[in-house]
Amino acid sequence: MTQSLLLDAARSKPVARPPVWMMRQAGRYMAEYRALRDKYGFKERCENPDLAVEISLQPFRAFRPDGVIMFSDILTPFDGMGIPFELVESRGPVIDPPIRTREQVEAVRPLDPEASLAFVRTILQTLRREVGEAATVLGFVGAPWTLAAYAVEGKSSKDYALIKQMAFSEPDLLHALLTKFADAIARYVIFQIDSGAQAVQLFDTWAGQLNPADYRAFALPYERRIVEQVRQVHPETPLILYINHSAGLLRHVGESGVDVMSLDWTVDMAEARAILGPDMAVQGNLDPCVLLGDQAQIRSRILDIVEKAGPTGHIMNLGHGILPSTPEDNARFFFETVKSLAPVSAR
């Protein structure tokens, strides 16, 4: 029942309660994870199947969420595309040299997941065996605008001025890079589903840095390009889209073709539902900082979101990843509260 719960909600089918999982549910707030972090580098944790499976399963064993997401990073496919990068603890990704010239864009290779990402297949196949029918196994990828933001900036950024400069001065160059990324990521999503992922989340985290017109020019077409290619091979697999600070883009995201819009906490759930309409499921959208507060407040906020989301087409989650300073007991309370909700018919 638990496995189908998340998939049914993603397809807006009736469910007894909202399924629940948590972005970054395998992470630094867990003592078990910190023990492995102290022994192994981040990239090794992502690419060593034994480590990635163990880390993915830590929150599953502790909290029994309805979704188990593969431990990985959105930049993982970069190596296979000829884009060297490092994942530096507490600093994030570093791409050196960053991609800023036509020659560099032309040098980006097509992605062959079978050749460069075989470890991802092993991770997902193992997770499916370990989880069985108890939860849905999720894969995830970065969407083209967000991947390009890292590739052009060379690291995380506060204002994304360099990629926006490219967008506004050399748009053809940026479109060429985005097209390469979209086709690569479409292949990667298909590969993840072939390997056992039952749903896949697209992280276009930094598309929220764009105004609606620029989102429609530089992000939305490439999200849609991925979805269309995946649908040709796996038409039934739910696809989820996450954009941080997406409130100003909600009137447009439906054109991406995804099944579920994952909302950050800055938009009211009822307002988001009204804008998105009845045909798109939603995910979210508790402020991660609420989990730093007392449990009465956590419960109150959960109930408010669930009520506003309505009885179908809602996956409970945070509005962004769980914070490293979150008490494990509060994470446990979050899961237990959602899982203990009365059936929809009894509310």
UniProtKB/Swiss-Prot annotation:
Keywords: Cytoplasm, Decarboxylase, Lyase, Porphyrin biosynthesis. Pathway: Porphyrin-containing compound metabolism; protoporphyrin-IX biosynthesis; coproporphyrinogen-III from 5-aminolevulinate: step 4/4. InterPro entries: UROD/MetE-like_sf (IPR038071), Uroporphyrinogen_deCO2ase_HemE (IPR006361), Uroporphyrinogen_deCOase (IPR000257). Gene3D superfamilies: 3.20.20.210. Substrate binds at R24, Q25, A26, G27, R28, F42, D73, Y150, T205, H320. One of its GO terms (biological process) is protoporphyrinogen IX biosynthetic process. It is found in: Cytoplasm. PANTHER family: METHYLTETRAHYDROFOLATE:HOMOCYSTEINE METHYLTRANSFERASE RELATED (PTHR21091), UROPORPHYRINOGEN DECARBOXYLASE (PTHR21091:SF169). Catalyzes the decarboxylation of four acetate groups of uroporphyrinogen-III to yield coproporphyrinogen-III. Homodimer. Belongs to the uroporphyrinogen decarboxylase family. This is Uroporphyrinogen decarboxylase. It comes from Gloeobacter violaceus (strain ATCC 29082 / PCC 7421). The gene is hemE.
